[in-house]
């Protein structure tokens, strides 16, 4: 039987570019190459799609450096012709990558002119796409919409779920309509705000401190600030303004959320074929190993400091609470019309209440990521996980 040819997209224009690269190294290392022929296609930070760049299989975080998709002398541009569907992937010449006069430009995707097809080589028939892209321009429905338009099967959530879950404000709206609790908060426009008005909104909403201020459409803890209660209003406004400015560097839409007195418990959801009943893993917990009052799970704790935390699956909670988390995760996945995979992050309060923090529709696949670790602890190996996800969209 011929191997199914799978384009693996990685990199991208988002802040999470390097995390996508590390996730892809894990995915390619675990993919069953007896069944699938992976075709790695990198996306540079400025949006160029390339093939034959640096081999992502060799990337890791051991050296403390974050990898990026870079154009090499061997790189060739990948161009798309949406009208040709699964046969619409083409390779240009190396000189086309940076040549504005070539007609290929530097856009996110180009539709080659028929007269230019002679300068292109077909990438061949593509059976499916596995977009290992985190954050905007990859996990937010944009790439999913492109693949839908082309009629190319792809792994993961569709346009609506991807867009709704990328935007934490609208995640709250959808889950609230489904009766699923989330952390209380207010939304601020970082382009046009005064700290006094924000403080008034916080007080009107009855939010208690500490607060977590974060971009609405970013991941991997980029731009997140913990804000404690100050002794006076002027200091409080200064702290809020600084935190909103930090979040605003990543997104103009900013969430101000009440800190929850509870444990952060994550659950992996798997639904290879859209419409099937979703499965939930044993929930896990990121345990922080540097104990201090100000620590929270920021970007450096996640990726740059291996000694900062470790993963425990299942989390050290009563089985009844773990089952509640699994139930909430499945319900949340259904509420957003999820497909393929997601990681549902929850808070579990001391009284056992489970509320959703966020839904990641393309969770990290790095060696330290919760999603593959949770499924491995539930009895699904890394390789089996990827196989099921790909075969689900080929059925």
From Swiss-Prot:
Mg(2+) 2 binds at residues 358, 360. Mg(2+) 1 binds at residues 345, 358. It comes from the Bacteria. It is found in: Cytoplasm. Residues 172-391 form the ATP-grasp domain. Pfam families: Dala_Dala_lig_C, Dala_Dala_lig_N. PROSITE patterns: ATP_GRASP, DALA_DALA_LIGASE_1, DALA_DALA_LIGASE_2. Gene3D superfamilies: 3.40.50.20, ATP-grasp fold, A domain, ATP-grasp fold, B domain. ATP binds at residues 204-266. Its EC number is 6.3.2.4. Coiled coil: none annotated. GO terms for biological process: cell wall organization; peptidoglycan biosynthetic process; regulation of cell shape. SUPFAM superfamilies: Glutathione synthetase ATP-binding domain-like, PreATP-grasp domain. GO terms for cellular component: cytosol. It is an enzyme of class 6 (ligase). It catalyses: 2 D-alanine + ATP = D-alanyl-D-alanine + ADP + phosphate + H(+). GO terms for molecular function: ATP binding; D-alanine-D-alanine ligase activity; metal ion binding. Binds 2 magnesium or manganese ions per subunit. Keywords: ATP-binding, Cell shape, Cell wall biogenesis/degradation, Cytoplasm, Ligase, Magnesium, Manganese, Metal-binding, Nucleotide-binding, Peptidoglycan synthesis. Pathway: Cell wall biogenesis; peptidoglycan biosynthesis. Cell wall formation. HAMAP family: Dala_Dala_lig (MF_00047). Belongs to the D-alanine--D-alanine ligase family. NCBIfam families: D_ala_D_alaTIGR, PRK01966.1-4. This is D-alanine--D-alanine ligase. It comes from Bifidobacterium longum subsp. infantis (strain ATCC 15697 / DSM 20088 / JCM 1222 / NCTC 11817 / S12). The gene is ddl.
